[in-house]
Swiss-Prot record:
Name of the protein in question: Exostosin-1
Record has DNA-binding as a keyword: no
Segments traversing the membrane: 8-28
Membrane topology (Cytoplasmic): 1-7
Pathway field: Protein modification; protein glycosylation
Family per record: Belongs to the glycosyltransferase 47 family.
Protein function: Glycosyltransferase forming with EXT2 the heterodimeric heparan sulfate polymerase which catalyzes the elongation of the heparan sulfate glycan backbone. Glycan backbone extension consists in the alternating transfer of (1->4)-beta-D-GlcA and (1->4)-alpha-D-GlcNAc residues from their respective UDP-sugar donors.
Lineage: Eukaryota, Metazoa, Chordata, Craniata, Vertebrata
Entry's EC annotation: 2.4.1.225
Source organism (scientific name): Pongo abelii (Sumatran orangutan)
Positions that bind UDP: 267, 269, 271, 280, 319, 324, 346, 349
Recorded catalytic activity of this chain's protein: 3-O-{alpha-D-GlcNAc-[(1->4)-beta-D-GlcA-(1->4)-alpha-D-GlcNAc](n)-(1->4)-beta-D-GlcA-(1->3)-beta-D-Gal-(1->3)-beta-D-Gal-(1->4)-beta-D-Xyl}-L-seryl-[protein] + UDP-alpha-D-glucuronate = 3-O-{[(1->4)-beta-D-GlcA-(1->4)-alpha-D-GlcNAc](n+1)-(1->4)-beta-D-GlcA-(1->3)-beta-D-Gal-(1->3)-beta-D-Gal-(1->4)-beta-D-Xyl}-L-seryl-[protein] + UDP + H(+)
Topology in membrane: Single-pass type II membrane protein
Post-translational modification: N-glycosylated.
């Protein structure tokens, strides 16, 4: 044992001596090196740094393992104070790790709600058309305010979309211009839109100026640089992308099985060198020229011939054989590989064409990924597994393909078909972050009609909206509230309004009746109204304008609303049948008086007709049933300009409601029975409401059609040839077998 102890002591002593010799040698070499530098500095009259620099710098070997936010230049930070270090780290945190909780001032939004201020455009500043469309969408939205003191969010008027220094759209000296804005406040509560950042050869995501604490609404943003719950990933869109409206998706009908001529297609540039070239250079391995057609061309850029390889000529020849549009509309899947940047125009093109996108862009934060579940509309691939893509998509079941295709159409029409929808979706996402207690859930964002038309301020319960009864396993309401719009004084007990009130009150589904008194004369005495089995509430309109009939009155206690003009002639049986039909289509307008629209080629404008034809696109609200949520949507979604037009003309409110409901549902209204309800000339000439007999009334409705279509950016009305009649309607059977037998006698 004693021998072992001696050996152990000797070994320990030797190890200690070796370590002392090693560190002493390092210090001696550092000292000699310092002495030489000191002599050299003395000869040149230079002052030498502190002796702290003599010590060996062991952390250098560990530098690759230091977190990025702690990596500093030690030479420049050795002498800074602890407070300066904290300030430096704080600055990094605010810029790189910003979240809503740390870099956004919520107090501005609590005062006046979610209002957005766009800086006024400065003289001499060039603004690309795409950015002008973004600003126009903001200024035309219900969020816009021209008063910065009322604003919760600020958007620059300086064009930040294209930050590629080689682009003609690049705005120079943006750093100083932004810093000079008196409301900038280091970017706090600011939103910056950007489509292109960086330039050849690395295409970094740097926008070229210090954004401070501003949020980014950015295309082609990587998951590495994306700040969750702060930035918003938007799609890359072209300068030709429509400002409003936009074309609908190209899926006109569902084919079963949902397979097309091509299984997988792509046609685009092949980058011979540089970033983004790896994947596109390898596409030829997957191309089979039959159902998998992946075409690339080398012909792009000024010096492509300098870099051309042995495959270029063959690829270029094959590329010219196929028409891109024909491939796009006849393919089941469309490959969306990355380009120089992560995003690609092919993404939106595939969505619109109902071609399921196969994403091949590792690290791309997909557009609006915070709210959209892309697994329901796309196949997320991996660039490293390119050769497995064909077998992967072939294994997808046909039911799944059909569901993916339908979801592409919904997402395209709900969020991507226009610049306005992209901007409004961005703003709605930010608003949901601010007011989390009334924010939309994933079901709202990913199911028809989408987040832009479902306003959570109306209700936080999905059962209060007409779109989710099936999802929640609920039945539509079993009662309705009749709202009668009265504009003429009550002078006789035989007036149509009193007969209408009695007929509606006798319905087994009627919960109450509200009379909206928009007449200039005082309210009639209570005894003038007939006695009914249901409550009758008379509301005197404050402004007595046409739009007041669609206000979301608290007195309406049911989800279903039976909207009636005072001159409407309906029986109780007709009311019951219409409500029964509506319960099967609670998201649509169901009623009696039908009208239609058409395109007048000679005048190049939309026309309105009340002629009895084989189709219709509107059901007027003088005798119709719909969900009361549309009152809220009419009041809070539509711009004041359209409602003011309706009020000034005392006309077109029913047309505007049809535009709104069709825009939301993407479906036509439903007409019941063949009865022709009142025409435009039925109203008596002695009434203040003789607007129906006014020759200018019809011309005004023509004008309204075009104004409304202009605001929506497209014509949302949809023609229908469907009319619903009672079972056995006019069949040669016993009248006792018919439930709604009185309808045949009318």
């Amino acid at each position: 044992m004693q021998a072992k102890k001696r050996y152990f002591i000797l070994l320990s002593a030797g190890s200690c001596l070796a370590l002392l010799f090693y560190f002493g040698g390092l210090q001696f070499r550092a000292s000699r090196s310092h002495s030489r530098r000191e002599e050299h500095s003395g000869r040149n009259g230079l002052h030498h740094p502190s002796p702290d620099h003599f010590w060996p710098r062991f952390p250098d070997a560990l530098r690759p393992f230091v977190p990025w936010d702690q990596l500093e230049n030690e030479d420049s930070s050795v002498h800074i104070s602890p407070r300066q270090k904290r300030d430096a780290n704080s600055s990094i945190y605010k810029g790189k790790k910003c979240r809503m909780e740390s870099c956004f001032d919520f107090t501005l939004c609590k005062k006046n709600g979610f209002k957005v201020y766009a800086y006024p455009q400065q003289k001499g500043e060039k603004i690309a058309e795409s950015y002008q469309n973004i600003l126009a969408a903001i200024e035309g939205s219900r969020f816009y305010t021209s008063d910065p003191s009322q604003a919760c969010l600020f958007v620059l008027s300086l064009d930040t979309l294209d930050r590629d220094q080689l682009s003609p759209q690049y705005v120079h000296n943006l750093r100083s211009k932004v810093q000079s804005l008196h409301l900038w406040n280091n970017g706090r509560n600011h939103l910056i839109f950007n489509l292109y950042s960086g330039t050849w050869p690395d295409y970094t995501e740097d926008v070229g100026f210090d954004i401070g604490q501003a949020m980014l609404a950015k295309a082609s943003i990587s998951t590495e640089n994306f700040r969750p719950n702060f930035d918003v990933s938007i799609p890359l869109f072209s300068k030709d992308h429509p400002r409003t409206g936009g074309e609908r998706g190209f899926l006109k009908f569902n084919t079963i099985p949902p397979l097309r001529k091509y299984m997988l297609v792509f046609k685009g540039k092949r980058y011979l060198t540089g970033i983004g070239s790896d994947t596109r250079n390898a596409l030829y391995h997957v191309h089979n020229g039959e159902d998998v057609v992946l075409l690339t061309t080398c012909k792009h850029g000024k010096d492509w011939q300098k870099h051309k390889d042995s495959r270029c000529d063959r690829d270029n020849t094959e590329y010219e054989k196929y028409d891109y549009r024909e491939m796009l509309h006849n393919a089941t899947f469309c490959l969306v590989p990355r380009g120089r940047r992560l995003g690609s125009f092919r993404f939106l093109e595939a969505l619109q064409a109902a071609c399921v996108p196969v994403m091949l862009s590792n690290g791309w934060e997909l557009p609006f990924s915070e709210v959209i579940n892309w697994n329901q509309a796309a196949v997320i691939g991996d660039e490293r597994l390119l050769l497995q893509i064909p077998s992967t998509i072939r294994s997808i079941h046909q039911d799944k393909i059909l569901a993916l295709r339908q979801q592409t159409q919904f997402l395209w029409e709900a969020y991507f078909s226009s610049v306005e929808k992209i901007v409004l979706t961005t703003l709605e996402i930010i608003q949901d972050r601010i007011f989390k207690h009334i924010s939309r859930n994933s079901l709202i964002w990913n199911k028809h009609p989408g987040g832009l038309f479902v306003l959570p301020q109306y209700s936080s319960y999905l059962g209060d909206f007409p779109y989710y009864y099936a999802n929640l396993g609920l039945k539509p309401p079993s009662k309705f509230t009749a709202v009668i719009h009265a504009v003429t004084p009550l002078v006789s007990q035989s007036q149509p309004v009193l007969k209408l009130l009695v007929a509606a009150a006798k319905s087994q589904y009627c919960a109450q009746i509200i009379v909206l008194w928009n007449c200039d004369k005082p309210l009639p005495a209570k005894h003038r109204w007939p006695a009914t089995a249901v409550p009758v509430i008379v509301i005197e309109g404050e402004s007595k304008v046409m739009s007041s009939r669609f206000l979301p009155y608290d007195n309406i206690i049911t989800d279903a609303v039976l909207s009636l003009d005072e001159d409407t002639v309906l029986s109780t049986t007709e009311v019951d049948f219409a409500f029964t039909v509506w319960r099967s289509f609670p998201e649509r307008i169901v009623g009696y008086p039908a009208r239609s629209h058409f395109w007048d080629n000679s005048k190049e404008r939309w026309g309105y007709t009340s002629k009895w034809t084989n189709d219709y696109s509107m059901v007027l609200t003088g005798a119709a049933i719909y969900h009361k949520y549309y009152h809220y949507l009419y009041s809070h979604y539509l711009p004041a300009s359209l409602k003011n037009m309706v009020d000034q003309l005392a006309n077109c409110e029913d047309i505007l409601m049809n535009f709104l409901v069709s825009a939301v549902t993407k479906l036509p209204p439903i007409k019941v029975t063949q009865k022709e309800q009142y025409k435009e000339t039925m109203m008596g000439q002695t009434s203040r409401a003789s607007r129906w007999a006014d020759p200018d009334h019809f011309a005004q409705r023509q004008s309204c059609m075009n104004t409304f279509a202009s605001w929506f950016g497209y014509m949302p009305l949809i023609h229908s040839q469907m009319r619903l009649d009672p079972v056995l309607f006019k069949d040669q059977v016993s009248i006792l077998r018919k439930k709604y037998r009185d309808i045949e006698r009318l």
